[in-house]
Amino acid sequence: MSTADALDDENTFKILVATDIHLGFMEKDAVRGNDTFVTLDEILRLARGNEVDFILLGGDLFHENKPSRKTLHTCLELLRKYCMGDRPVQFEILSDQSVNFGFSKFPWVNYQDGNLNISIPVFSIHGNHDDPTGADALCALDILSCAGFVNHFGRSMSVEKIDISPVLLQKGSTKIALYGLGSIPDERLYRMFVNKKVTMLRPKEDENSWFNLFVIHQNRSKHGSTNFIPEQFLDDFIDLVIWGHEHECKIAPTKNEQQLFYISQPGSSVVTSLSPGEAVKKHVGLLRIKGRKMNMQKIPLHTVRQFFMEDIVLANHPDIFNPDNPKVTQAIQSFCLEKIEEMLENAERERLGNSRQPEKPLVRLRVDYSGGFEPFSVLRFSQKFVDRVANPKDIIHFFRHREQKEKTGEEINFGKLITKPSEGTTLRVEDLVKQYFQTAEKNVQLSLLTERGMGEAVQEFVDKEEKDAIEELVKYQLEKTQRFLKERHIDALEDKIDEEVRRFRESRQKNTNEEDDEVREAMTRARALRSQSEESASAFSADDLMSIDLAEQMANDSDDSISAATNKGRGRGRGRRGGRGQNSASRGGSQRGRDTGLETSTRSRNSKTAVSASRNMSIIDAFKSTRQQPSRNVTTKNYSEVIEVDESDEEEDVFPTTSKTDQRWSSTSSSKIMSQSQVSKGVDFESSEDDDDDPFMNTSSLRRNRR
């Protein structure tokens, strides 16, 4: 594409391409907290200065799945500052926007909204950091989309089949088919490609007249047999692929000789890990497209914090370092000090004339101390550079290469993976879980749960703060195994049950689709549980709080009028009774007061424990419960089980006193001969101190306690 063609704006699309901005990364750090916001400001300023038609983002606009208010506020502030205005948009949308943006409440491009004044549209897919989660499957990009600042596209609504429908753009005689695919777990997407479940739809008319641009956010480098997306999986009619997620900047388009399309990897806009791939200079791209021709102009970012990295191997310097020398540690420190000073001098030299670049650089010196050397204290050494570098705590990284042993089986060298990360990537949580169980001894292997399910549950817990993910996965797989055993009618022998559990687990592992369904169902349960807890937490209104305060005040008045006794007894005589002759009720149930039609709901701190213990029984207990008929002995046993869970010696210290009302009831009832079931129920009454905290205690009960 010639220079004259590139400057012909009438028929030329000008697109600013960026990816992996990671807004909010280390926002609480005193030195690096504003780095991502400053870089986004520079990117948007470049877009406005070059008068681009639109901005194209390749995912991970946010670093956290639930960005902070500061991060969201700053992002909206910058988008409003640079992307709104009176400059007209020169291209039009030809495709059905209800299909392209069908998951949005406003299924049309933002610059065509009559209530908004957009001068630079932003099109973005979601990445693995800011992907949709929760019961409603929302992400931070949906907030920006609802506010009218970002056009979120490339979202797949199905986990079984993906149809990628392009956004069709036209400017003059140039037509672009913009395809997008937001981040999907690599193994799942790999399997869908293999099973031909991914389809890229093409325009029906004049297929060859469209420039096909595809934006994807997946692993490009190989992390495992299926934990990446090979370039050969993509359709060969594509002209250019914008590949997000990989942080090393390889923005110059490279040709895939097999598929004959070009791939541009813009890389991250900020340093998020001290790895070799991040040390490459950061750029964004100004993509010009006219007809079927393109040109990618690299634009360096001047506000990115400098990052210098160097490796040294102590064993390669036998003339300087001798592990038998008692002063070898001092020699190593002096050598490292010299290397770091050299990197700081290079940083100062490169920063000359660029006042927009942060003053303190990132420095990482990796030291291989193989060969009998010992590492020194990094914390003490780094004190010398606190005021000169942005990362003094991890300025030096010690590692060593272990000798390769004869492999008796498949083993994972974690030291090699950690000390030599591949091209700017880091290990993922689910990979570590899988690798751990692959190399673990037999006695610590999972026998009921699956490694893949546990890996994804841990990932949801760590990356997306789904606190119930692990618990719900365990419950779901346990329930499914219990149902399987009940349907098989196996004898209640431990050996046979273990064998059936092992066979059932192996069959599930072979059926990957079934395992996917299990994980999805467990994650859906966890998200629904979180949504319910959030709704219940916000259900109390001001009137509820006032009623709680009133109940507490009345209960406090009752306690003040009745002197407390020093009796520490438990069981009979403890808790609210509401008068003599009242029927006892088990904890967590309801009790009916004398001469009243009102039911008072009773609560206990231990009620949840009792219910949970009875519900989450073991496999053998669950199996036995279906084989035995209920009897009186079974009922008595159930009471003893609840007592065993609820009772604890610590309760005596928590509730050391009882009121005179309790003593009066106790003295009256002690003369009676109580049955075993009555004794079991007696321990379930709440103490008077629980009344102070119970906002649902009715007024009649409070009055009886006063009398």
From Swiss-Prot:
Q: Where is the composition biased (Acidic residues)?
A: 643-654, 686-695
Q: How is it modified after translation?
A: Phosphorylated by ATM at Ser-675 and Ser-677 in response to DNA damage, promoting MRE11 activity: phosphorylation activates MRE11 by preventing the interaction between MRE11 and the C1QBP inhibitor. Phosphorylation at Ser-648 by PLK1 primes for phosphorylation at Ser-687 by CK2, inhibiting recruitment of the MRN complex to DNA damage sites. Asymmetric dimethylation by PRMT1 promotes MRE11 exonuclease activity.
Main EC class of this protein? Answer: hydrolase
User: Where does it live in the cell?
Assistant: Nucleus; Chromosome; Chromosome, Telomere
Cofactor dependence: Mn(2+)
Positions carrying Phosphoserine? S2, S275, S618, S640, S648, S675, S677, S687, S688, S700
Give the protein name, as stated in the record. Double-strand break repair protein MRE11
Species per Swiss-Prot/TrEMBL record: Macaca fascicularis (Crab-eating macaque)
Give the encoding gene's name.
Answer: MRE11
